[in-house]
């Protein structure tokens, strides 16, 4: 989210190096001993341009949330309590009438159904050489950009630091 700087990325990389050294000194077996989500050999490489799957699950029907007023949202991040007053809540229905019961709700559902990695990404993001494993949240995209179909890129500097930390660890 907004606020990450190269200073934060440097701290993350330095800390990942320290913990990597510890893991390696202890000779931990990542297959059997434990799991640390910071390290993943499958991430930090280009994504196939044909892979259009969006990282975020909040653009479909897999993360439905409901507020106390009975409004239905694609995810909790679209609710008023998550938007920090930066956007209007992005509901797609209500408990009395169902999902997609108005033209506005239908329009929002159609918008989200069309979101994929290509539509939400700039060319720099889409063709990033370490795109695999880069996460995003369409609700946060909506909060800062006014649309769920425009990827916020504040996390880039931290993803790069994590990639460097993985390079250090795995090599």
Descriptions of predicted regions:
Residues 1-72, 79-90, 151:
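Radical SAM enzyme [4Fe-4S]-AdoMet core and its adjacent flexible, acidic
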Residues 74-75, 136:
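Short glycine-/small-residue motifs
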Residues 80-171:
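Flexible mid-to-C-terminal extensions adjoining Fe-S/redox cofactors in radical SAM and related proteins
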């Amino acid at each position: 989210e907004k606020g990450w700087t190269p200073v934060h990325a440097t701290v993350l990389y330095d800390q990942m190096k320290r913990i990597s050294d510890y893991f390696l000194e202890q000779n931990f077996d990542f297959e059997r001993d434990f799991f640390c989500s910071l390290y993943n050999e499958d991430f930090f490489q280009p994504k196939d341009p044909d892979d259009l799957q969006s990282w975020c699950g909040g653009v479909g029907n897999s993360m439905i949330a409901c507020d106390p007023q009975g409004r239905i949202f694609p995810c909790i991040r679209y609710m008023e309590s998550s938007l920090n007053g930066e956007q209007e809540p992005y509901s797609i229905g209500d408990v009395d009438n169902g999902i997609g019961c108005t033209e506005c709700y239908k329009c929002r559902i159609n918008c989200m159904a069309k979101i994929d990695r290509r539509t939400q990404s700039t060319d720099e993001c889409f063709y990033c050489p370490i795109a695999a494993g880069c996460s995003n949240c369409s609700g946060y995209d909506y909060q800062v950009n006014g649309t769920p179909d425009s990827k916020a890129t504040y996390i880039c500097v931290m993803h790069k630091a994590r990639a460097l930390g993985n390079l250090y660890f795995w090599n």
